[in-house]
Swiss-Prot record:
Function: Catalyzes the transfer of the diacylglyceryl group from phosphatidylglycerol to the sulfhydryl group of the N-terminal cysteine of a prolipoprotein, the first step in the formation of mature lipoproteins.
PROSITE patterns: LGT
Organism of origin: Prochlorococcus marinus (strain MIT 9215)
Subcellular location, record wording: Cell inner membrane
One Pfam family, short name: LGT
Residues noted as binding a 1,2-diacyl-sn-glycero-3-phospho-(1'-sn-glycerol) in the record, renumbered to the chain: 154
Membrane topology value: Multi-pass membrane protein
NCBIfam families for the chain: lgt
Gene giving rise to this polypeptide: lgt
GO aspect biological process, one term: lipoprotein biosynthetic process
Protein name per its UniProtKB record: Phosphatidylglycerol--prolipoprotein diacylglyceryl transferase
Top-level taxonomic group: Bacteria
Length: 297
């Protein structure tokens, strides 16, 4: 009797090896995310009568601050992986092997979206102040591109065989090579493809935010800032659930895979951001109601 075994398997982290330089999937996906995000954000800026060139102007600082924030956040909470003999890593450039601090080896994986959001927000606030742009409106323009970039970027985890969930035998199970498995699960071959769960969830959020963006000027319900707060709520809701499946969490007071005796950092931050989003929408609605009352009075 023939039994077909279906599962997902990464082809590896390398997209193209040209000999003198290696192009990895993670870096390629980040680049694709940036280009698509640039296109989408310019379209949305034009729809809000904001100079689309502002998107091009902020892009370099936004990329740098987001990547630095995401990497710093991860390294701080996983310092044991980057200290001592792991402080440096090898990098191939023009047929030569050079040593660089592991902190800068972003293409090897190890970034945290919450750190990227913090770094990016700092850059956005500074830019809006310097250009005298409404902060809430500008963030609403950028948010759809950010969540779409998160959806695309999650596939970098797939190619790197990282950020997967606990063992499973579901039809869409993900095969993980033994060298990438946690010690606790060496005897298991198949795991939850949490990268796929989050990628699809983020894609749904992107579609919902674009629909709301197109209705924002037609109703007072979706005031400037609504999209940003809804992003915090929806992304945090999905991330909290998905994080509970992962075997490589950043922990406070505990150790992976389950943060025994501690708490998963991403879940803690998700609760905070979810609550912040709810409070933000509450005050937006309160301000809208007060404005209507003053107008009617």
């Amino acid at each position: 009797m023939l039994i077909l075994q279906a599962f997902i398997q990464s082809p590896g982290e390398t997209f193209l090896n040209l000999g003198f330089i290696t192009i990895r999937w993670y870096g390629l996906l980040i680049s694709v995310s940036v280009l698509i995000g640039l296109f989408v954000s310019k379209k949305l800026a034009k729809a809000r009568n904001i100079n689309p060139e502002y998107i091009s102007e902020i892009l370099p600082s936004l990329i740098i601050s987001s990547i630095l924030g995401a990497r710093a956040y991860y390294v701080i909470f996983e310092w044991r992986q980057y200290s001592g003999e792991n402080f440096f890593t090898s990098f191939e450039l023009f047929n030569s092997i050079i040593k660089i601090p592991s902190f800068f080896a972003v293409w090897e994986g190890g970034i945290a979206i919450h750190g990227g959001l913090i770094g990016g927000l700092i850059s956005i606030i500074y830019f809006c102040k310097s250009k005298n742009i409404n902060l809430k409106t500008f963030i609403d323009i950028l948010i759809p591109s950010i969540i779409l970039g998160q959806s695309i970027g999650r596939w970098g985890n797939f190619f790197n065989n990282e950020a997967f969930g606990v063992p499973t035998n579901l039809p869409w199970k993900l095969f993980i090579p033994i060298q990438n498995r946690p010690l606790e699960f060496l005897n298991y071959e198949f795991f939850h493809p949490t990268f796929l769960y989050e990628s699809l969830w983020n894609l749904l959020i992107f579609i919902a935010l674009i629909i709301i963006f197109n209705k924002q000027n037609k109703t007072d319900f979706f005031r400037p800032g609504f999209i940003s707060f809804l992003y915090l709520i929806s992304y945090s809701f999905g991330r909290f659930w998905i994080e509970g499946l992962r075997t490589d969490p950043l922990c406070i007071g505990g150790l992976p895979p389950f943060c025994d005796g501690g708490i998963r950092m991403a879940q803690f931050i998700s609760i905070f951001l979810f609550s912040s989003g709810l409070i933000g929408i509450f005050f937006l609605r309160l301000r809208s109601c007060n404005g209507k009352n003053r107008k009617n009075g």
